[in-house]
Amino acid sequence: MHKIINHPLIKDKLTRMRKVSTVSTVFRTNLEELTQLMVYEATKDLELNEIEIETPVVKNAKGYKLKNKICLIPILRAGIGMVDGVKSLIPTATIGHIGLYRNEETLKPVEYFKKFPKNISESDVIILDPMLATGGSVVEAVNIIKKYNPKSIKFVCIVAAPEGLEYVQKIHPDVDVYIAALDDKLNENGYITPGLGDAGDRIFGTK
């Protein structure tokens, strides 16, 4: 399943991020805020346990808590820019990291870094990456994460190319994908158009 989150605030913030004149600090701030809006939607179906609590007024009141732990896994490096937006909503979430690069001969993603919390098998996992281009990195990230048997896996991104979205859903139809915008296509250089440019460079001001 994939869902395009259609909301005026998302469209406004995404437009600011797309503009070539947007400086790194503004890009990062809007990415963080946009991620909050995206994750609010992506977590609507999380399971809850009913609990009993005491309020200032009554001793026995009904409350709720998340049934499973939450684990955030940003894909390095651009995915790091989305973490704080989620942590502000789910401060108890643990964080793992996956680093992938593309082999220039085979064009396939290769893992160069991986560090996961010990509780990942007890967690609902949310993968974070601003861009879904060819889909190769996301598919490989899911391949790696599935070996740890998490409760569920969701993927949250900002912009996606149709080619990448189709590939992810073909290989991992059980992973729900949440996007702010489905863009037109990949250009001859593999960039999403109209896209955001190189999200990592724009987040960290490295170009």
Swiss-Prot record:
<dbReference type="InterPro" id="IPR050054">
    <property type="entry name" value="UPRTase/APRTase"/>
</dbReference>
<feature type="binding site">
    <location>
        <begin position="197"/>
        <end position="199"/>
    </location>
    <ligand>
        <name>uracil</name>
    </ligand>
</feature>
<protein>
    <recommendedName>
        <fullName>Uracil phosphoribosyltransferase</fullName>
        <ecNumber>2.4.2.9</ecNumber>
    </recommendedName>
</protein>
<dbReference type="GO" id="GO:0044206">
    <property type="term" value="P:UMP salvage"/>
</dbReference>
<keyword id="KW-0328">Glycosyltransferase</keyword>
<keyword id="KW-0021">Allosteric enzyme</keyword>
<dbReference type="InterPro" id="IPR034332">
    <property type="entry name" value="Upp_B"/>
</dbReference>
<keyword id="KW-0342">GTP-binding</keyword>
<dbReference type="Pfam" id="PF14681">
    <property type="entry name" value="UPRTase"/>
</dbReference>
<dbReference type="InterPro" id="IPR000836">
    <property type="entry name" value="PRibTrfase_dom"/>
</dbReference>
<feature type="binding site">
    <location>
        <begin position="129"/>
        <end position="137"/>
    </location>
    <ligand>
        <name>5-phospho-alpha-D-ribose 1-diphosphate</name>
    </ligand>
</feature>
<comment type="function">
    <text>Catalyzes the conversion of uracil and 5-phospho-alpha-D-ribose 1-diphosphate (PRPP) to UMP and diphosphate.</text>
</comment>
<feature type="binding site">
    <location>
        <position position="192"/>
    </location>
    <ligand>
        <name>uracil</name>
    </ligand>
</feature>
<dbReference type="InterPro" id="IPR005765">
    <property type="entry name" value="Ura_phspho_trans"/>
</dbReference>
<dbReference type="GO" id="GO:0005525">
    <property type="term" value="F:GTP binding"/>
</dbReference>
<dbReference type="GO" id="GO:0000287">
    <property type="term" value="F:magnesium ion binding"/>
</dbReference>
<dbReference type="GO" id="GO:0006223">
    <property type="term" value="P:uracil salvage"/>
</dbReference>
<feature type="binding site">
    <location>
        <position position="77"/>
    </location>
    <ligand>
        <name>5-phospho-alpha-D-ribose 1-diphosphate</name>
    </ligand>
</feature>
<keyword id="KW-0808">Transferase</keyword>
<feature type="binding site">
    <location>
        <position position="102"/>
    </location>
    <ligand>
        <name>5-phospho-alpha-D-ribose 1-diphosphate</name>
    </ligand>
</feature>
<keyword id="KW-0460">Magnesium</keyword>
<comment type="pathway">
    <text>Pyrimidine metabolism; UMP biosynthesis via salvage pathway; UMP from uracil: step 1/1.</text>
</comment>
<dbReference type="InterPro" id="IPR029057">
    <property type="entry name" value="PRTase-like"/>
</dbReference>
<feature type="binding site">
    <location>
        <position position="198"/>
    </location>
    <ligand>
        <name>5-phospho-alpha-D-ribose 1-diphosphate</name>
    </ligand>
</feature>
<comment type="similarity">
    <text>Belongs to the UPRTase family.</text>
</comment>
<dbReference type="GO" id="GO:0004845">
    <property type="term" value="F:uracil phosphoribosyltransferase activity"/>
</dbReference>
<keyword id="KW-0547">Nucleotide-binding</keyword>
